Amino acid sequence: MFPTAESGFLDPAATLAGRASVAAKTLVQERPDPAEVPIPELAPQWKKLDLAEILKRPAAFLSISQTNSLYKPWGSQAAEKQWERGTLPATIKVVKAARRAPNFKSFSWIGYPLFRENHPQSIFDKVQYESWIEGLDFDEAKKKADNELVEELRALVQPGDLEFDECALQTAFVGTPLPLELSRKRIEVIVLTGIHLDWCIEGNTRSARDLGYLPIVIGDATATRRIDQQAAAYERINNFFAPVISSDDFVRLLGQGS
């Protein structure tokens, strides 16, 4: 999930059930077609690397926040209409290819609950988390369903995969089983998909780099809250933190030399 760039908080108007359709319509009018947001050319430093060789190293797949909240019309973030934006087919393509590769030793499906009343929190967290759910009337069952992995990806989960929620503001590397999983399996490369590109994906990519991992972001398997913010997020991540490639490029690179 991702707060607005303007305020740092999710826009309450976009989450009010009675106004969700208006917010969604406005959002669509403001943003370009997703097909008009190309994944950028690799930054010069990444062109010096043999990405096919890197993708043969011990690797992990992370899906972040690909939940009902964003992909179902009744979800708490439904105004974004993420189901229209192609991230699920791209993610499925990546997962199926990674399952066939023997070096992919870890698969994690990571939730990001919007409802965080029971999470550890500072006073900053408290007011921010409360702002995300203003106007939402979800009972406990609907809150739980909101953060469940969307069914298209649920069908791809296998025994031994990790399933957990982020509990920090914005990283899966704090307070979760992920660091131990990556350490025990001697992981070097982390492939990321999910939402939002400029929040959970960018933040976890930065964390992965700082911890010594080699993150690779699958651009068409990620999305920003607003499409008009996607190009800038691609450029920022690609220029400073990690290669951003397409799902087709991932499959092609993974198949080289096999």
Language model region names:
Residues 67-73:
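Short acidic, Gly/Ser-rich segments with clustered Asp/Glu that frequently serve as metal-coordination loops
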